[in-house]
């Protein structure tokens, strides 16, 4: 199993390009099931989760042509099965996103209950309730969601918890439903907006994406389209925090600052300089490698977009471990999302957990050790901690990283980090 070996203590300098967003690409790949016309997608990241979704779509009969390293053309004109088997979805929670499109276009679906990171229950009942409100008959049998509907009907759906994948699934299903669907308490994440923009290019009638009320007027069919996947705000944020911690100056191209307001505010609060332009972000920082004690502690509280993103919580915890005073990190989205704490403590971090809040007391330095990645963002936070730790850090089980970061070690090496993957 691959490991990362990192020699800490090097400020970062240079420029890297931010990849397309995994969390936008996955639902957009599923949107290809809604039409028999080709869907051409550019800026698709090369990640394990994307490869898993491609395998699932191929299993269903979708033809996928590679037009370039990050460009795919999907053709779902000859789908021959509407089943997503357990073996293909057990590692990826986003597989539930085929449910809405299959049901809307083909009238039936059999989808295994999904897997993914072990960070909380992440229930799919909101997806099911929403589809039932639109007229679907659904039951769960031997770990599979069995759904059928002769024709989905527009409905008013209130989601009592903000759910990104739930919003996406119901929005896709509603594009081919009869009449008007109103999704209330909808997720406002940029990835939801990107999916809506792609669907509109395919002929869907959607208004309100990016607000908490999305209206979808169903159409008879969708058609061929082309779409560029939005940049990955979490990848960008991760490299921004890395630069703030190590010190140096890094320019991120293909990055949108307007998607990162909460993260940028907190980075500036920590003492980093952040300069934003149309398609790039520059981060400058003294950092703790050459200037210990210059990083200011920042307290954060996660909440749905546009508030502070849960997917940046672990990275800011890493920052706070080497900051000047005490910070609190409060997680309100997922339970079990402090699994990185124990591993950070192996590097010398001073962290106490009380319920859904971690109290982080900054210290002058961390020390290298062997640690284990537990989920996608936790593994990223361990990389950040290792970049400023004294000596060598070995991070095991980095397959979690490969699910969500494209060529992370190559990009960090490009910025001067001493990092290598070993088999």
Swiss-Prot record:
Q: Which Gene3D superfamilies match?
A: Enolpyruvate transferase domain
Q: Does the keyword Iron apply?
A: no
The record's listing under CDD domains reads:
UdpNAET
Q: Where does phosphoenolpyruvate bind?
A: 22-23
Q: Which GO terms describe its cellular component?
A: cytoplasm
| InterPro entries attached to this UniProt entry | Enolpyruvate_Tfrase_dom, Enolpyruvate_Tfrase_sf, MurA_subfamily, RNA3'P_cycl/enolpyr_Trfase_a/b, UDP_GlcNAc_COvinyl_MurA
> What EC number(s) are associated with this protein in UniProt?
2.5.1.7
Q: Which UniProt keywords apply?
A: Cell cycle, Cell division, Cell shape, Cell wall biogenesis/degradation, Cytoplasm, Peptidoglycan synthesis, Pyruvate, Transferase
> Which reaction is catalysed here?
phosphoenolpyruvate + UDP-N-acetyl-alpha-D-glucosamine = UDP-N-acetyl-3-O-(1-carboxyvinyl)-alpha-D-glucosamine + phosphate
Give the positions the UniProt entry annotates as the active site.
Answer: 117
A GO molecular function for this record? UDP-N-acetylglucosamine 1-carboxyvinyltransferase activity
Which residues are recorded as binding UDP-N-acetyl-alpha-D-glucosamine? 93, 122-126, 311, 333
Name positions with the PTM 2-(S-cysteinyl)pyruvic acid O-phosphothioketal: 117
| Main enzyme class | transferase
Gene Ontology terms: biological process: cell division; cell wall organization; peptidoglycan biosynthetic process; regulation of cell shape; UDP-N-acetylgalactosamine biosynthetic process
Q: Superkingdom, according to UniProt?
A: Bacteria
The pathway is: Cell wall biogenesis; peptidoglycan biosynthesis
Its subcellular locations are: Cytoplasm
Is-annotated flag, keyword Lipid biosynthesis? no
**HAMAP family per UniProt:** MurA
Q: What does this protein do?
A: Cell wall formation. Adds enolpyruvyl to UDP-N-acetylglucosamine.
Q: Which family does it belong to?
A: Belongs to the EPSP synthase family. MurA subfamily.
Name recorded for this polypeptide: UDP-N-acetylglucosamine 1-carboxyvinyltransferase
Species name for this entry? Methylobacillus flagellatus (strain ATCC 51484 / DSM 6875 / VKM B-1610 / KT)
Q: What is the lineage of its organism?
A: Bacteria, Pseudomonadati, Pseudomonadota, Betaproteobacteria, Nitrosomonadales
Q: Which gene encodes it?
A: murA
